[in-house]
Amino acid sequence: MAAVSLTVNGKSVTADVDSRTLLVQLLREHLRLTGTHVGCDTSQCGACVVLVNGKAVKSCTVLALQLEGADVLSIEGLAPADGPLHPMQEAFRENHGLQCGYCTPGMILTAVDLVRRKGHELDDRTIREELEGNICRCTGYHNICLLYTSRCV
């Protein structure tokens, strides 16, 4: 066991973890932040995406110990539980960008990162290329792609 200290959703966290503990396991099992989903455990589906130091990262591929001092934002930290939705969450809701919801946390955090990086330079091709690492079996991506061109960008 080894200690790792990082910031998760704005709160300082120190946890004793096994050297093989993945970030997704730290979030879900140690911190009980279950909004980050595990779909494939092989970096294929994107359901486990969180923001690490502001960048989208598949949390099933990163060891918790690698994140010493990092700033991690999971879907639970994107907007206050008792406050308004984040603009990207609102865009998903308004544009029907979800059905079963399993991929939604990863899709939303990927979208937040993409809009931060590309902003008004987004076009349909770029959006589709950037979403290749996020699998949704329900929506067919059409509404998800449309929401990028809504009021979020």
In which residue ranges do the predicted regions lie?
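Signature of N-terminal electron-transfer/Fe-S-associated modules in redox systems
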Residues: M1-S150
